[in-house]
Design a protein with these regions (language model features):
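Extended charged
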Residues: 1-6, 10, 25-28, 50, ...
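Flanking scaffold residues of small Cys/His-coordinated metal-binding clusters
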Residues: 14, 30, 47-51
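Active-site-adjacent scaffolding segments
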Residues: 17-18, 28
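Short beta-strand-alpha-helix junction that forms the catalytic/metal-binding core
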Residues: 19, 43-63
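Right-handed parallel beta-helix
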Residues: 21-23
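Histidine-centered catalytic micro-motifs used for acid/base chemistry in nuclease
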Residues: 34-40, 56
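Short edge-strand/loop segments of extracellular domains
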Residues: 38, 43, 72-74
């Protein structure tokens, strides 16, 4: 089933045009962000707005139909961050330089790992390079996001 235009608009505005996983700005992207099914349709998820999140193409692709990830510290299977039920700043902070997302809870760490939000395993660090440019342009990170203290 396809998400209708009104729902797509609601999801984009509700997210303040940020990827709800990595907080990249849609306006700084070469492609419109995807409407992500938090509980994937393949696992019975619906098109209800409470099951939808705005996701950049990277996060949407890496998340695929996964709902769990591995906490790299404990090796436990942990539910991924749920944008409708959890607050981003409770699970993630930006590094002091604003280039890397740091998971501060098992959920945050498992999500960072599953979605490879800092390109530690893919793309030769291209997202960190992009964030550096966005930082220079004053577009990143979002002002309301917490940052690691020096």
């Amino acid at each position: 089933m396809t998400v209708n235009d009104a729902t797509r608009k609601l999801v984009r505005q509700r997210a303040n045009f940020l990827c709800e996983y990595c907080h990249s700005l849609e306006e700084a992207s070469a492609a419109k962000f995807a409407i992500d099914h938090i509980l994937p349709q393949s696992l019975g998820g619906s098109d209800n707005p409470d099951n939808l999140a705005l996701a950049c193409q990277r996060c949407n692709g890496y998340r695929y139909n996964f709902t769990t990830g591995i906490d790299p510290q404990t090796q436990e299977v942990i539910p991924l961050f749920h944008p409708r039920k959890q607050k981003w700043s409770d699970h993630f902070i930006w590094s002091t330089d604003g280039l890397r997302i740091i998971g501060v809870t098992p959920t945050g760490q498992a999500t960072c790992n599953r979605l490879d939000v800092n390109d530690e395993r893919h793309n030769e660090g291209s997202i960190v390079k992009a964030r550096r440019l966005w930082l220079q342009g004053g577009w990143h990170p979002p002002e309301e996001d917490p940052r690691q203290q020096t």
